[in-house]
Amino acid sequence: MAQDRKKVLVLGAGYAGLQTVTKLQKTISTEEAEITLINKNEYHYEATWLHEASAGTLNYEDVLYPVESVLKKDKVNFVQAEVTKIDRDAKKVETNQGIYDFDILVVALGFVSETFGIEGMKDHAFQIENVITARELSRHIEDKFANYAASKEKDDNDLSILVGGAGFTGVEFLGELTDRIPELCSKYGVDQNKVKITCVEAAPKMLPMFSEELVNHAVSYLEDRGVEFKIATPIVACNEKGFVVEVDGEKQQLNAGTSVWAAGVRGSKLMEESFEGVKRGRIVTKQDLTINGYDNIFVIGDCSAFIPAGEERPLPTTAQIAMQQGESVAKNIKRILNGESTEEFEYVDRGTVCSLGSHDGVGMVFGKPIAGKKAAFMKKVIDTRAVFKIGGIGLAFKKGKF
């Protein structure tokens, strides 16, 4: 019987990959399949909490937990390794720790920051990308305040922070900054009036997924807490001094001691090397989340460009979508093992909430707009639910937001 076991290989332990595996281990027996999960790190991190760790309002260690803590070791083989090559036809995946065969492959390799070729952005701006970059950024911000307080010749630029991007991540990071800055000013005896936070956005509107009313709430709340917005202002370069922006056709230098890029992500760069038709690390999938020509390969999460039937544009890359895709793929793998046909993925939009620090927010929940403390509470519910969905009640108590 063991010789008939299928090899199920899952690449990536982010929201999509880990949701797939934790669902599979509940529904598939060891006689049916051998499940292997490969991830670069020994830990999973809550990517939707990185803005908190980056600002320093949440310890970076609270954002992560060991992958193996949510796995059934008798059901899943966990390998800490970096994937270097995917050979679709040979059904092999190469890593820095060896080669792994598969009958069914799930690609959930996650995201990396996308700077869209802006000169100097990768070299001179912090990225909100993973727990390592989050820790570096939060420490850098605090170091700037400490150095300013200790310096005899003070440079106000040390207290200036530039944030590129007024989308979801950028705005949530701004909210956390407005919570963190008063703490740092109190700790180091810094006049808060000297702190300058500027958000630069190329698009004509921030938070494009929300109504004008919700956007106005977010802008008013953040402006009241010291944030200045420069909307419809493209960043053309980044240097050691800050951002270079374009205003009315002319370039202007914005100076700051800290520059942060929060305006774009893309799927894993391994995608272009492994598949055709990949754009920004994402490949268009079929309705069951497999790819053309390979019914045994699923692509989900940030690497997937899933276009719902009848639609023209792919769904955005969100944790909510990634986790629903993981559940769908787990069910379809079970169906494949049973000799049944796969089912189409159907996304259920339960809503989206953008936090503005720990006490405010804006969002749409089941089609209804919410703002203020209600939105902040709902955000904590969403964050805790995500942990519960993967690790159960125990992990929710340990890592949840309540």
Swiss-Prot record:
Biological process, per Gene Ontology: aerobic electron transport chain
Disulfide bridge partners, by residue number: none
Cofactor comment text: Binds 1 FAD per subunit.
A single GO cellular-component term on record: plasma membrane
Key words, A-Z: Cell membrane, FAD, Flavoprotein, Membrane, NAD, Oxidoreductase
UniProt cross-references to Pfam families, sorted A to Z: Pyr_redox_2
EC code: 1.6.5.9
Subcellular location per the Swiss-Prot or TrEMBL entry: Cell membrane
EC class: oxidoreductase
Residue numbers annotated as active site: 172
Main location (coarse class): membrane
Cofactor(s) the protein requires to work: FAD
Positions contributing to FAD binding: 12-16, 39-40, 83, 302, 319-320, 379
SUPFAM superfamilies per UniProt: FAD/NAD(P)-binding domain
An annotated Gene Ontology molecular function: NAD(P)H dehydrogenase (quinone) activity
Family statement: Belongs to the NADH dehydrogenase family.
Protein name: Type II NADH:quinone oxidoreductase
Species annotation: Staphylococcus aureus (strain bovine RF122 / ET3-1)
